[in-house]
From Swiss-Prot:
GO terms for molecular function: mRNA binding; structural constituent of ribosome. Residues 136-150 have a biased composition (Polar residues). The gene is rplM. It comes from Synechococcus sp. (strain CC9902). Transmembrane segments: none annotated. Residues 127-150 are annotated as: Disordered. One of its GO terms (biological process) is translation. GO terms for cellular component: cytosolic large ribosomal subunit. This is Large ribosomal subunit protein uL13.
Amino acid sequence: MNKTSLPPIDSIDRQWYVVDAENQTLGRLATEVASILRGKNNPNFTPHLDTGDFVVVVNAEKIQVSGKKPQQKLYRRHSGRPGGMKVETFESLQERIPERIVEKAIKGMLPHNALGRQMYRKLKVYKGTEHPHSAQKPQPLQLNPSATAK
């Protein structure tokens, strides 16, 4: 009978990675980042523990989508009040708050429970190349070549 080894929470060594979103396809970038946030790249991955690493995404305003999605993909939010639904296209949201596009795509690929919320807190998304996490010495993360937009 095999026994599952549980890594102690203190022994989990979290790495910091920086990902450049320039000319990356939104969904392909989001799946790779979500996998790292979950910890699936670590040998001590455990589904019910947060074993993931920190990820800093830069150049969020340069993310790409294919086809007519810039004009047709819609982002909805609701104020909680009657008639408070706001709908915005990818293009207009990318002009206003490009970080939200990447955050929303990655958050949707994480578990929808308390553990997923804990994993989501390790994601940092910034417009432009500057970020305040240089003290953590994040390693540049090269995504799969197939994840690059053509």
